[in-house]
C-alpha cells in the first residue's frame, strides 16, 4: 500500500486526493496515515466550510474514518509524533 501522512487541514486533504488520482492511473490505492486523529491541540480552528470540504473529499474517496466533526482544529504533521504504518 501507499500511505500518505499530511496536514489535517483542507490543503492536506486536497494533496491526499490529488495523490489518489495519480495512483489510480496505475491501479494503486493511497491510504491516509494518521490523518484520522482528533486534533484537539491544533493551532487553528477549521471553518465550517473547510470541514464540509474535507468531509466531502473523505466521503468521495471512502476515507470515512478521517471525517471531521465540528469544532475541529487544523494540525500540521510536524506537530505529531510519527508512527510507522503496519
Predicted features and spans:
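TOPRIM fold recognition
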Residues: 2-86
Amino acid at each position: 500500500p501507499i500511505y500518505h501522512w499530511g496536514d489535517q487541514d483542507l490543503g492536506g486533504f486536497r494533496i491526499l486526493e490529488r495523490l489518489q488520482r495519480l495512483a489510480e492511473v496505475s491501479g494503486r490505492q493511497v491510504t491516509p496515515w494518521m490523518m484520522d486523529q482528533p486534533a484537539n491541540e491544533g493551532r487553528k480552528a477549521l471553518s465550517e466550510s473547510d470541514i464540509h470540504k474535507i468531509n466531502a473529499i473523505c466521503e468521495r474517496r471512502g476515507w470515512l474514518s478521517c471525517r471531521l466533526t465540528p469544532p475541529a482544529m487544523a494540525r500540521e504533521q510536524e506537530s505529531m509524533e510519527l508512527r510507522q504504518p503496519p
